[in-house]
């Protein structure tokens, strides 16, 4: 049996962390942003058959990991093919750093929609929002969103060097005879553990474990890190582990972030909490 621990403190206790929490984060001064859009990096898109300024509009929602002693950041980049996030094409860029603040970037994306088996699910919206974790034997597993501008699907890819990737398709394609294939889903956080200074993918009771979801937090298990089975209730509906809370910073959505971490005090999951734009009628200063 596993449990997820997440913060419940209100805005009045925002600096008081429980003893299980990770805290003390600080924003380095005068270094941000560390990766920004660039107009002059071109990429020949195999689908449009044209040279694209692939990272000219946005660079955001990155994943970070270690490879050969360097920090590697895989970041989502959007071109200027449309207006508004999600209406352009996303590809994943590759950047390295030895200090965490100064980065060297590849000129071409390392992961993108192509003339492959995933084209129908990734074009024209692209490949979005990577989360990366690694096994003890050095296999990098990336959860990302396939976006064809109809249904966002949580998908899996693997690599040994973070540049050459094998796409495995939607994470839930085979679960329950394909019941969740057309489910809109994203944001997969695979469970990890810090072992001798390395953050590695961990099994629970012989299975890999993943938290996922954008509006609510759900969970899934896997035997091979490729095919995932969502955890469901007795009636077959998805089991919600936690959801948005009225009157808090996460009143609109609770979206899984980087890989969850198993600790002696429980599993720590960092998530993106977004509040509604409404104002509580009895407290005009509090978002609801």
Where does each model-flagged region fall?
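Intrinsically disordered, low-complexity linker/loop segments enriched in Gly/Pro
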Residues: 138-148, 155-158, 171-175
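Short, His- and charge-rich active-site/binding loops that engage polyanionic ligands
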Residues: 73-74, 82-99
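Surface loop/turn signatures of beta-propeller and other carbohydrate-active proteins
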Residues: 10-65, 101-133, 163-202, 228-262
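Hydrophobic core segments of beta-strands in well-ordered, beta-rich domains
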Residues: 62-84, 128-149, 187-220, 260-261, ...
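Single conserved hydrophobic/aromatic residue that forms the stacking wall/gate
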Residues: 279-288
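Bacterial Sec-dependent signal peptides at the C-terminal "C-region" and cleavage site
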Residues: 1-10
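Short consensus segments that form the blades of beta-propeller domains
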Residues: 52-54, 81-88, 121-123, 147-148, ...
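Beta-propeller blade signature
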Residues: 91-99, 154-161, 218-224, 282
